[in-house]
């Protein structure tokens, strides 16, 4: 599992992720130059002793070349200096609209204005939050401020020897493109002679895997699960609009912010491709929806977002005062006379990849069978994700990794007798966990189709950020976080990486 930006340490029983990779054809390898901060690394980037090193193995599979065109939304950068910003055509520099009200952006900009560049010497590392396959994440404080960040530190030498420089570059370039309330903010990135660092948003609530373990029965209520998956769905919709296939959705990668809302993390396995957003009339969309689901997908049957009505929660059915049958009939007749609004569909359906990447319990059948895959793998993992939140386990887990893979391909979906969940929840999971991707819910219309499913009835998509989260994390006591003593940086990073195992299954 890749590194976390949250506060909790990494449990030993977390699921295993796989991807042994070869360079993808459309990317250039990253060259690294020596910079003036090289002499400061040993004294600045030091690690405190920690017991959070991961003992479970991340299983890596053979990754073949991807056959999709790369999006020009974010072009790969061949420069490698200590610059905090790089080239990203959509959102670069100060063009991200949500920077304005963030005090952390102001603090970062103040340091840049004063010193010209931002580097390791401007941060105080407080403690290690977790470690992953390509780096270690630390809680860091910007000197002279009360601004805290999650800093991901990657040993470039170790990445090069393990042929993972491309993954680190891919993650950085994707993070530079993102500007969404449920996706991470990359405040800065810089490099030293030995290390590549990403300065990101810190999520004190840990991840959904850890939070689920604390729930009664180690599972979420259906209402809580609906809250989390709705926010994840909006994040996935945004990623697909940018031509980014996530490929690593699981509770461990969904972090909880201080306000209880969530944030997706870890994009080193993501695939970038071309996408062509299309505006389609709802009448066409509804007819397609009826073919793929037993539910009515007519716009009149689907609750549309509204910024006018303000329910106390965005995740509860709305109740209206009773009206006479005559009034209801007149309303229906009026509604039938109004043409439904067109809908935006931005699903990268043409993307194809032969990469064998992901976590065993979340791998889609088409990945395991080596048939090539596209954006539909994200909707398969979405179904596994919802299943795990509701039932406390994944549906195809076997006695071992090989058995799990065989179950994904050959075993039918089964629901446990307990806990009892709604028919709509089961139907959504069943529609997503279809082994043939072309018959899977959201295969053509993506999140647009998902939002219309009855499981999300009562969700006001325009006001999701106004909803009350199921749980608010306890405030973090930053004062009690011990400062890191001097230690050998390279030794600590190599120590973390030695905890990862690589296996070949095929």
UniProtKB/Swiss-Prot annotation:
Disruption phenotype: No visible phenotype under normal growth conditions, but the quadruple d6pk, d6pkl1, d6pkl2 and d6pkl3 mutants are deficient in lateral root formation and mildly agravitropic, have fused or single cotyledons and narrow and twisted leaves, form few axillary shoots, are almost infertile and impaired in phototropic hypocotyl bending when exposed to lateral white light.
Keyword vocabulary terms for this entry: ATP-binding, Auxin signaling pathway, Cell membrane, Kinase, Membrane, Nucleotide-binding, Serine/threonine-protein kinase, Transferase
Chain segments carrying region Disordered: 1-96, 475-495
Biased composition (Basic and acidic residues): 12-23, 55-67
InterPro entries referenced in this protein's UniProt entry, alphabetically: Kinase-like_dom_sf, Prot_kinase_dom, Ser/Thr_kinase_AS
Subcellular location: Cell membrane
The keyword Transferase is assigned to this record: yes
Binding site for ATP: 129-137, 152
Biased composition (Polar residues): 24-54
GO biological process: auxin-activated signaling pathway; basipetal auxin transport; phototropism; protein phosphorylation
Enzyme class: transferase
Active site: 248 (proton acceptor)
Ranges of Low complexity composition bias in the record: 77-92, 480-492
One MF annotation (Gene Ontology) recorded for this entry: kinase activity
Any single Gene Ontology cellular-component annotation: plasma membrane
Family of this protein: Belongs to the protein kinase superfamily. AGC Ser/Thr protein kinase family.
Function text: Protein kinase that regulates the auxin transport activity of PIN auxin efflux facilitators by direct phosphorylation. D6PK-mediated PIN phosphorylation promotes auxin transport in the hypocotyl and this is a prerequisite for PHOT1-dependent hypocotyl bending.
Domain notes: The activation loop within the kinase domain is the target of phosphorylation.
Name of this protein: Serine/threonine-protein kinase D6PKL1
Organism: Arabidopsis thaliana (Mouse-ear cress)
Organism placement in taxonomy: Eukaryota, Viridiplantae, Streptophyta, Embryophyta, Tracheophyta
């Amino acid at each position: 599992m890749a590194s976390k930006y949250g506060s909790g340490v990494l449990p030993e029983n977390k699921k295993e992720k796989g991807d042994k990779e070869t360079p993808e054809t459309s990317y250039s390898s990253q060259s690294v130059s020596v910079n003036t901060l090289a002499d400061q690394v040993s004294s600045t980037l030091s690690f405190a002793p920690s017991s959070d090193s991961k003992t479970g193995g991340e299983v890596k599979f053979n990754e073949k070349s991807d056959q999709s065109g790369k999006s020009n939304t974010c072009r790969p950068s061949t420069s490698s200096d200590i610059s905090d910003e790089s080239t990203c055509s959509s959102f670069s520099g100060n063009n991200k609209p949500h920077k304005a009200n963030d005090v952390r952006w102001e603090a970062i900009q103040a340091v840049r204005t004063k010193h010209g560049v931002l580097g390791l010497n401007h941060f105080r590392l407080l403690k290690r939050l977790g470690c992953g396959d390509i780096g270690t994440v630390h809680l860091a404080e910007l000197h002279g401020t009360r601004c805290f960040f999650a800093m991901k530190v990657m040993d470039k030498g170790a990445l090069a020897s393990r042929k993972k420089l491309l993954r680190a570059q891919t993650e950085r370039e994707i993070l530079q493109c993102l500007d969404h309330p449920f996706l991470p903010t990359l405040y800065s990135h810089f490099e030293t002679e030995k290390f590549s660092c990403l300065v990101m948003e810190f999520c004190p609530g840990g991840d959904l895997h850890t939070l689920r373990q604390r729930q009664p029965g180690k599972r979420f209520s259906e209402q809580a699960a609906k809250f989390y998956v709705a926010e994840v769905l909006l994040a996935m919709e945004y990623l697909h609009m940018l031509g980014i296939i996530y490929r690593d959705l699981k509770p461990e990668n969904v972090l909880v912010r201080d306000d209880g809302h969530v944030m997706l993390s870890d994009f080193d396995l993501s695939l970038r491709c071309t996408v062509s957003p299309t505006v389609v009339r709802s009448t066409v969309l509804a007819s397609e929806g009826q073919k793929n689901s037993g539910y009515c997908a007519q716009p009149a049957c689907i609750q549309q977002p509204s910024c006018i009505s303000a329910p106390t929660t965005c995740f509860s059915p709305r109740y209206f005062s009773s009206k006479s049958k005559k009034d209801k009939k007149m309303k229906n007749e009026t509604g039938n006379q109004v043409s439904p609004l067109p809908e935006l569909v931005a699903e990268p359906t043409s993307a194809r990849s032969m990469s064998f990447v992901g976590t065993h319990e979340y791998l889609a059948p088409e990945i395991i069978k080596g048939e090539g895959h596209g954006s539909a793998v994200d909707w398969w993992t979405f179904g596994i994700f919802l299943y795990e939140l509701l039932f406390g386990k994944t549906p195809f887990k076997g006695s071992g990794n090989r058995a799990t893979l065989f179950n994904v391909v050959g075993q039918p979906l089964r629901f446990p007798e307990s806990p009892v969940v709604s028919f709509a929840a089961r139907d959504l999971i069943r529609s997503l966990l279809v082994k043939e991707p072309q018959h899977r819910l959201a295969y053509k219309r993506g999140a647009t189709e998902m939002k219309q499913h009855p499981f999300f009835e009562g969700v006001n998509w325009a006001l999701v950020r106004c909803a009350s989260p199921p749980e608010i994390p306890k405030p973090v006591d930053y004062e009690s976080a011990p400062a890191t003593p001097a230690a050998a940086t390279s030794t600590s990073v190599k120590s973390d990486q030695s905890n990862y195992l690589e296996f070949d299954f095929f």
